[in-house]
Every structure is written in C-alpha cells, then in structure tokens.
Amino acid sequence: MLAYRPRGATEATRLRSSSLGGFAAAGVAAKAQALPLLIALLVAAPAFAQAPPPPPHDMQAMPDQQEYPRLKISGFGDLNFATTKHPEGPRGFVEGQLALHMASQLSSRVTFFGEISFTPRGDAGTGSPATSGFNVEVERMVVRFDRNDRLKVSFGRYHTPVNYWNTAFHHGQWLQTTIARPELIQFGGRFLPVHFVGALVEGAVPARGWNLNYKAGVGNGRGPVLSRAGDAGDVNGKRSWLVNAYSKPDALFGLEFGGALYVDTITMPGAREFGERIVSAYAAWQKEEPELIAEFAAVRHQENGSGTDSWSRAFYVQAAWRLPPLERAFKPYYRFEHVGIDEADEVFAPLPELDMSIVGLRYDVSLHAAAKAEYRTWTRGDGSVRNHGGFFQVCFTF
C-alpha cells in the first residue's frame, strides 16, 4: 500500500538534502524580499475589514422560501422463477417488471406524480420489423392541486380507486407481501378496471376520530380492450364516474375500511353497448402483527335496451404475520381467492372461474430487498382440473 505523504513534507525533505549554506542564504534573501510586501498588507488591512464578503447564495434566501420543482425518483424491480404441474403461464426464470416512480413538488400546493414500467415481452424479436424486448407503459401521470386537506383536485391517469389493493400497492412487487396481485385486480386483467383517465376530487375530514376520506371522479371508460383505459379518448363518449369512501378510525390504529361504486358504459364488438356497475367493499388491518385484508367486488352488466342483467362476483382474504425473531425478517402468509362468472354475463364470457389457495413466506433480506416463496393450488373453469406449482421471487427498491 502506498503511504500518503503531504506535499509540504516532500518539499521539506528536498530542502534538507541541500547544503546548509545554500539553505541559509536562500532564507535571508527571501526575508529581504518579503519585508515590503508585509508592510503593504498591514497598511491595507483596515480597508479590507470595511468590505466584508457577500453572504452565500443560500443565506440570501428567506427562511421559508423553497426552490421548485423538486424531483424525487425511486425504482422497483423483481426477478421470478415458476414451475407448475400443468403448463400455465410463464415457467422457469422470468425477468420481472422494472418500475420508476417520479414525484415532483411544483409549488407549495401543486404536485406531480408519474410511474413508468418496463415489462418483458414473450414475442420479443419476432415479426418484421422485430418487436422490442420490453413494453414501455405510462402507468400513472397525475398533477394535483391542493386547496387544503379537505379538498384536492387532480387530473391524469390513475390506478382506479375502485378497491383497496389497486391504490395501496402500485407497480413494484417489493411493496406488497405476496408475489402477485389478487386475480380480481391483476395488471392486464379484465374483472376490475385497473386504470382510469380523467379528473378526481378527494379529501379527508377528521369527523371526531373517524378520519373519513372521500374520492369522486369522472373520466373515460374502458377501451375496446377491457383491460385498457381510454388513454386516447372515450370509446363511446359516455363518461364513467366513481365514488369512493373509507375510514381510518383513531380508536383502532391500523384499521381501514370502505367501499366504492363505479359506473360505465362498455362498447363491445358489433357496437353492442352494456351498462356496467361495480360495487366493492373492503377491510384492511395493516399492523404486520397481524396483516389482514379482505375484499369483495360485484360487477353488473346489462345490455342497453335489454332487461336481462348478470352479476359476476369475486373476493379474496389474505392473512400474514411478521415474526418477532431474527429482527422481524420473516413474514408467513396465506391467501384464498375466488372469481365467479355469471353464465349470463356476455362481457366476461371469456373469463374462467377461479378458486385458489396460496401459502407463502416473505424474507426481508434488508430494508430494500426481499425474497418470497409460494406454493399455489388452484382450479379454473368447472374445477375438474386442479393445478399446483411453486413460485419464487426476488424483489427490491432503489
């Protein structure tokens, strides 16, 4: 290892290697030359003292003054492995999704939030020209104006506040306990509308410790592909609207419960239009010891001009517990899911019914990385064929 030697020490060594006589002579000459300069500095010192240097830039600003915009970026990623008895979905090692969250304070009352995802394609390199290896998607893009805690108005592309999971756990598998979302609110799923493009009004009211929160919005309905929001405009000119209300009571810290109503008109192939009404309810206890989440959603479809309607229903129940030993790094969990499709539901006709049980364990390797392992068993359709498999995930935030 090279030892650090200050420059002054090196210079002193060189001088010591010279003759003593030369050193003394040089010193006398230097003193003679420095004397006039020293006198000049002493005479000018009072003048310099009367003109102090200007204060630094940050000292000139007012104490409460902020600089805008202020941008913060955080990222999430995951890598997966899957093996199943019967072929269904990706198997082997699978590159997960890379997500970037961007939050920017534009002023004391205006904020922006954006979310971009990069998802690997199964058909990468095929076609002419060849498809790219990833789909790049603007998941959320919201600008919000805050009047106060009771009134906030925003515009953009949201995760639809139609249930609890969709607004509690965004893109980034590290954020949630389990490897995957529940089937009823899967990204790319069709049972509930995951994204919403429009305007939203929200706020919170203390209400004697009940801490009531509300959201109300209007925007474009589902696109021709049910899993897509109307990013480029409403497909039929009939706006969707929603209301959401929930409570976080002070008396039961960690508890949140509420519900939502979503109304839309869906245009199917052949220009057939169906009225859609979604009602949902949930309760969530997020204290880690335990973590309990239960949600129910019912979707009603009725073709315009017809008296026949259908109701499809789905729910899930999830329980987890953060174990005290080993610095609370281990968190076992269980989830049961059910999706029931009405035989008369023409909109959801392609969707199979589902019953699934998941047993898993999350291990937080550090504050910013985790590993998850799951065993799943499930049936689809009429339930005659049962599948099961093992799943593993490494996820992180940066």
Predicted regions and their residues:
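Bacterial N-terminal signal peptides
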Residues: 31-46
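Outer-membrane beta-barrel pore domains
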Residues: 83-88, 129-133, 142-146, 154-157, ...
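A short secondary-structure junction signal
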Residues: 211-213, 225-231, 269-270
